[in-house]
Amino acid sequence: MSTHAFQKKDEIRRGLIGVLLLVSIGLHTNRVDAQQSDPQPKAIAVGTSKVWGKVDGIVIEGLVQGPSSASTELQVACVFEYTEGDIFKSPPALPPPLNGMVHLDEALKGQITEIRKTGKFAGHAFEILLITPPAGTMKARKLLLIGLGDRDKFSPDLMISIGKVAMREALILGVNNFAFASDLKDAGIDSPTALVAGNVTKGIIEAYRTQAYLKAKKLSSFKPVTRVTLLAGPAFFSTAGEGIKNAIASFKN
C-alpha cells in the first residue's frame, strides 16, 4: 500500500473515531440534562384549595377554579380593552375547556363579550363595572370587572394597583370575602405567574392597611374582609402560590 493511501485511510479512521466520540458525548449530555431538568408538575385537580397565609386577619387562599364557579360574595375578574375574539383565539388564549373567562362569558350568555365589544365597558385600566348575575348563572353574588387597559402595554407592576382597586371596591360593598381572577392567561398574555400573583396580593394588603389606618384616625369605617381567594388554573396553581407566599412574607418582615 502506498504512503498516500495509508495516510488517507488513517485520516478516515480518525474521523470516524471523532464522530463516535461526539455522538457519545451528546448522548451523555442529553442524559445529564434530562436528569437535571425540572420535574413535570403534578396535575392539580379542579377544586383544590390551599391557605397560603394570613395577614392582618385576612386569610389568603389559593383555589383551582374558574370565576364562574367559585363560591364567594364577590367575584373579581380582569379584562383588557376589547380586540375581536381575544378570549376565544387559542393560542395565544387558553383553550376553551381551560379558559375561565370563556366560561364566565358563557354563564352570562355572552354578555361579557357584548358589553366589551359595544364599548359599554371599554376595559380601560382601572375602569370598573359591577354586575349582579341572575340567580343560577354563577356562584358569586356579585361580579366586579376591572379593566387592564391596552394588552400591548401590560406590565406585571400594574397588578399591584389592580389588587388595590379590588380590595377598595370590596370594602365599599361591605363583603366579608371575595375571589380574584386576573384572567391574563385566558386573554393570551404570557405573564410571569408568580410575580403577577404576588403583586395582586401586595396590592390587596396595601389597600386594606390604608383603610385600616384611616379607620384608626376616624376617617373611615368598614366591615372587615376576612378571606381573599386567588383563583388559578391547574397548571399555574403551585407557581402562583409561591408568589403569594413571598408577598405575604414581605409584610411580616
Residue ranges with predicted function:
Residues D10-E11, H28, P224:
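Short alpha-helical segments used as structural interaction elements across diverse proteins
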Residues S2-I17:
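Bacterial N-terminal signal peptides that target proteins for export
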Residues I17-L27:
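Bacterial N-terminal signal peptides
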Residues Q35-N253:
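Glycine-/small-residue-enriched capping loops at alpha/beta junctions
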Residues N30-D33:
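Sec/Tat signal peptide C-region and signal peptidase I cleavage site
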